[in-house]
Amino acid sequence: MDAIQEAIDTVETLRKRITNISEDAMDLLFREARTHNAWTDTPVTDTQLLELYKLVINGSTSGNCLPARFIFCRTPEAKSRLIPCVNPGNVAKLEAAPVCAIIGYDTMFWEHLPQLFPHRDMTAQYRDNADHAETAAFRNGTLQGAYFMLGARAMGLDFGAMSGFNNKA
């Protein structure tokens, strides 16, 4: 069986087994979901972060491009390096959080497409057009960031999405 048919069969099997998620799960992920501004002092372990990463890394993107890159800052030293990058109103939130996840993207993601999307070579459209690669990386990395937040919540963790930072810092 080829990879495309195998993927189709996997989704069809899942759809037969799981027709929808519970109302409680929909509330948790969407209807009652809000960005948090305060944290408990409960630590988030490396095991939890790895589990979260594995849960969300293959979420659907255009052509399986998967450009997101994740950096986790947990120690006071790591967080102190971020302070110059965040707006003053976000410093206390950053310091109080058990972990800060930086979700970025790699504009050279296309180098991995032969493994991620093996049934069709899509590298030329990005290799030969840096602007297109940047746009695709931003768009699809943003999707992966959203998957990360939903995955965190599904695992019993929470997040405070932060856009108040200085890109030039």
Residue ranges and their predicted role:
Residues M1-A169:
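Acidic, surface-exposed loops and disordered segments
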